[in-house]
Amino acid sequence: MKDYVAFDLETTGLSPDSDQIIEIGAVKIRDGKISGKYNCIIHPEIEVSDFIINLTGISRDMLRKGIPLKEGVEEFLEFSGDLPILGHNVMF
């Protein structure tokens, strides 16, 4: 596969039931080379622990200025277009 989008998420924790996405990062690969980048910080609806702040390097100020999840997902999908989407470290 020569053309695709690889993405990675940062979250408030590991629970799909109670934790939330706080960052979406992606690169678009065309002909084996990076042809575009996308990154957004998501404003979470829950408090983020000091552990996650330190682990991700995403500050509380950055989170306060983040965009809503729906907006971030819409932007990511627009960035991705019709390319296959591959997740990074999706097994955790």
Give short role names for the model-derived ranges.
Residues 1-92:
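Conserved non-catalytic scaffold segment of RNase H-like nuclease domains
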